[in-house]
């Protein structure tokens, strides 16, 4: 019987096709973020570029930050707590080149302050990687009054992007067009965006809220592509894979036990370095130069859920909805009191 956790869309993957088809757990032959950089000749070759990452101090964020630093470019690593960030990222930090940026993505005030700080230090931004996130937590509101999963997974990132949008556009070059990379999740299958009740007032359920926010991440990058792709700014979203990180801290222990109990699930799991590989593909893959509006998994464009598969792989039909994407964009501007 085929492993239901293996995507059936590895025909275009070339070098790693077999590794993805023969999953064997964290640290197997599937590529790491640094492998992807090497494959794309990006090691120490981007010294004139600037990158910003959110959610840098835990899980795949650390490995994504490590890969960004390896490009040779200027890197800003967004962290909620500067002291914890310094401890987690100590071996990556390099004064004047790889720096921490205080950023609590769930606080719109913090996002505005961080964007202002960034712009005071840099007039350039080539890739924005929106990686910070939470998953399946109990219902809570942020200080701004937004549902917390929506605020942290999506709305804070939308605000950060909007505040840096003109810098991304002006930094785009013919040889490397600017990119916005949103780390979404297979959890987008759980729900489309609930446009008429986006904060899920009176209908909150933790997985529905997660799906609502993670589909919003996909819609955001699709709409960036629609609006700005022809101007040299591209949006890509992705599923990093199954990685054991602090992201799961709110998940019911029994659910976690079920997730990890089957052999296919154990083999499906990736290390954090492997989990960051798809993010780095979206950010630096030469096959995505000048392209966007796609959802990636396993370092390539995802196809639909394979027959007999599970919702852990593949992309849901509702992930591409041009009408919904425009409505979400307009709603987000209104919620954040922004104008175009």
From Swiss-Prot:
Its EC number is 1.1.99.-. Pathway: Sesquiterpene biosynthesis. It comes from the Eukaryota. InterPro entries: NAD(P)-bd_dom_sf, SDR_fam. Keywords: NADP, Oxidoreductase. Gene3D superfamilies: NAD(P)-binding Rossmann-like Domain. The active site is at 184 (proton donor), 210 (proton acceptor), 214 (lowers pka of active site tyr). Induction: Expression and the subsequent production of PR-toxin take place under static culture conditions (oxygen limited), whereas no expression of the PR-toxin genes occurs under the strongly aerated conditions required for optimal penicillin production. There is a negative control of the transcription of the PR-toxin genes by the penicillin biosynthesis gene product(s), or by a regulatory peptide encoded by a small ORF inside the penicillin gene cluster. Pfam families: adh_short (PF00106). NADP(+) binds at residues 60, 84, 104, 131, 162, 210, 214. The keyword Zinc does not apply. GO terms for molecular function: oxidoreductase activity. The keyword Nucleus does not apply. SUPFAM superfamilies: NAD(P)-binding Rossmann-fold domains. Short-chain dehydrogenase/reductase; part of the gene cluster that mediates the biosynthesis of PR-toxin, a bicyclic sesquiterpene belonging to the eremophilane class and acting as a mycotoxin. The first step of the pathway is catalyzed by the aristolochene synthase which performs the cyclization of trans,trans-farnesyl diphosphate (FPP) to the bicyclic sesquiterpene aristolochene. Following the formation of aristolochene, the non-oxygenated aristolochene is converted to the trioxygenated intermediate eremofortin B, via 7-epi-neopetasone. Belongs to the short-chain dehydrogenases/reductases (SDR) family. This is Short-chain dehydrogenase/reductase prx1. The lineage of its organism: Eukaryota, Fungi, Dikarya, Ascomycota, Pezizomycotina.
């Amino acid at each position: 019987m085929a492993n239901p956790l293996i995507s059936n869309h590895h025909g275009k993957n070339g070098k790693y096709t077999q590794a993805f088809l023969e999953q064997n757990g964290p640290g197997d032959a599937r590529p790491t973020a640094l492998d992807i950089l090497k494959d794309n000749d990006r090691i120490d070759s981007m010294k004139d570029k600037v990158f910003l990452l959110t959610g840098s101090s835990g899980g795949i964020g650390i490995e994504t930050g490590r890969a960004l630093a390896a490009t040779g470019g200027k890197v800003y690593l967004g962290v909620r707590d500067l002291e914890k960030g310094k401890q987690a990222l100590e071996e990556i930090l390099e004064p004047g080149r790889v720096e921490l940026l205080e950023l609590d993505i769930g606080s719109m005030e913090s996002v505005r302050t961080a964007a202002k700080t960034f712009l005071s230090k840099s007039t350039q931004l080539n890739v924005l990687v929106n990686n910070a996130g939470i998953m399946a937590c109990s219902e809570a509101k942020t200080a701004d009054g937004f549902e917390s999963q929506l605020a942290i997974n999506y709305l804070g990132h939308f605000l950060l992007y909007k505040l840096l949008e003109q810098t991304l556009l002006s930094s785009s070059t013919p040889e490397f067009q600017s990119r916005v990379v949103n780390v979404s999740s297979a959890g987008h299958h759980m729900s489309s965006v609930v446009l008429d009740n986006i904060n899920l007032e009176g209908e909150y359920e933790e997985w529905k809220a997660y799906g609502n926010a993670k589909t919003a991440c996909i819609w955001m990058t699709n709409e960036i592509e629609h609006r700005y792709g022809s101007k040299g700014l591209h949006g890509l979203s992705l599923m990093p894979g199954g990685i054991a990180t602090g992201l799961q801290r709110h998940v019911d222990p029994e659910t976690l036990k079920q997730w990890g109990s089957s052999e296919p699930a154990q083999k499906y799991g990736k290390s954090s370095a492997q989990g960051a590989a798809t993010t780095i593909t979206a950010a630096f893959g030469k096959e995505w130069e000048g392209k966007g509006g796609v959802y990636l998994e396993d370092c390539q464009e995802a196809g639909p859920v394979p027959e007999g598969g599970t919702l852990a792989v593949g992309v849901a039909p509702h992930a591409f909805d041009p009408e919904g994407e425009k409505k979400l964009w307009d709603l987000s501007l209104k919620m954040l009191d922004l104008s175009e």
